[in-house]
Amino acid sequence: MRVLIKNGIVVNADGQAKQDLLIESGIVRQLGTDISPQLPCEEIDASGCYVFPGGVDVHTHFNIDVGIARSCDDFFTGTRAAACGGTTTIIDHMGFGPNGCRLRHQLEVYRGYAAHKAVIDYSFHGVIQHINHAILDEIPMMVEEGLSSFKLYLTYQYKLNDDEVLQALRRLHESGALTTVHPENDAAIASKRAEFIAAGLTAPRYHALSRPLECEAEAIARMINLAQIAGNAPLYIVHLSNGLGLDYLRLARANHQPVWVETCPQYLLLDERSYDTEDGMKFILSPPLRNVREQDKLWCGISDGAIDVVATDHCTFSMAQRQQISKGDFSRCPNGLPGVENRMQLLFSSGVMTGRISPERFVELTSAMPARLFGLWPQKGILAPGSDGDVVIIDPRQSQQIQHRHLHDNADYSPWEGFTCQGAIVRTLSRGETIFCDGTFTGKAGRGRFLRRKPFVPPVL
């Protein structure tokens, strides 16, 4: 199979040029002007469009069971939505397994979930839900099998204490793995939540008030210090929602600590006023939406390079699930928002088209740095000879209004309903195969491949 993309502006993290792109057998073979292939091929005219590396979303939750509910996107509907939004690779955060289970247990479960359903290429982050000698001894074997990142939680059912975190940080560092962490102070949250519930204050806005930004920022600072104590272990902070936490990360970077951070479109474009709407329960996620001032601080981090990655934390529960389970009580509502289909378009529209970031910085945030950090570079995250032919073509001249009825996930709403975006995703190619074109999904379940990722190598800070 040969595909020639002509007349587009090909953009990588280190530059852009108007040139053609030739893909053969799923691999980029040539970039240049006026490429004339010797053999017949499909030609795609990208005149006036940007040709970007396919998106790499390193934070999704497909088919996750959170105890009170199972998310409504599995690995088919979730990756279908990703493909239609220009994302060609996902790394899914596996959910918790049975109490006392080994690391391999969840890997086998999740490979079963994805094997015959994933539309695009995929991998998983390991999840460490308890610490003992067997778990610590298993980590190097998991890294050898291609899982080079693991998640720790400082809140929820399987939160780790500081001693357990230190043990995990040390062993992950020694084994060539990157530690990722959900940082919130669980004790402080529990205290605030109990206070509100006792007073009968259970409306959605009290979800945000029960998880103030200081709970997140304190946990970020604590993880930075613990990583330093653990031998300067590399650390990746997921779903940053506030500027104080970013300040702590800037300080760590100034002290040459190997720390990286992601944020998500919801923290850049939605704010806490959503909780006071009639459908406020559909915006319940953790950490919660913040105020506009915190948004501005995050945009500064996007613009100046302090934030490394924009992912989604896609975790979809329908409004029917939310209403039936919560019965109006924020503390009972399953947490998470859909968004895997909208990430690329939202950041392109609100970032590139407003002049906040360059097209090159867009690539850095959405594909290049995610691929570097998580052991996929240069197979993913770049359009260069030898890399996978994963491509998203965006037409900056088109304007689109987001409406859930046109999306491809399995939710029954979108938090982005009514948002108008400048720039439209017109085609997505995965390993040279068109899987989305002009509003129509053209891929198929099961074509996605499991990616064995390389051990962690820190990008230059």
From Swiss-Prot:
Record PTM N6-carboxylysine, positions in chain: K151
PTM characteristics: Carboxylation allows a single lysine to coordinate two divalent metal cations.
Residues engaged in binding substrate: Y156, S286, N335
A Pfam family annotated for this UniProt entry: Amidohydro_1
GO biological process: pyrimidine nucleobase catabolic process
Catalytic activity: D-5-phenylhydantoin + H2O = N-carbamoyl-D-phenylglycine + H(+)
Entry's cofactor comment: Binds 2 divalent metal cations per subunit.
Alphabetic keyword roster: Hydrolase, Metal-binding
Binding residues for a divalent metal cation 1: H59, H61, K151, D313
SUPFAM superfamilies in the record: Composite domain of metallo-dependent hydrolases (SSF51338), Metallo-dependent hydrolases (SSF51556)
Co-factor(s): a divalent metal cation
Enzyme nomenclature, EC number: 3.5.2.-
Disulfide bonds: none
Gene Ontology MF: a single term: hydrolase activity, acting on carbon-nitrogen (but not peptide) bonds, in cyclic amides
GO cellular component: cytosol
CDD domains linked to this entry: D-HYD (cd01314)
Positions that bind a divalent metal cation 2: K151, H182, H239
Purpose: Catalyzes the stereospecific hydrolysis of the cyclic amide bond of D-hydantoin derivatives with an aromatic side chains at the 5'-position. Has no activity on dihydropyrimidines. The physiological function is unknown.
Family statement drawn from the similarity comment of this UniProt entry: Belongs to the metallo-dependent hydrolases superfamily. Hydantoinase/dihydropyrimidinase family.
Quaternary structure and interacting proteins, as annotated: Homotetramer.
Protein name: D-phenylhydantoinase
Species this chain originates from: Escherichia coli O81 (strain ED1a)
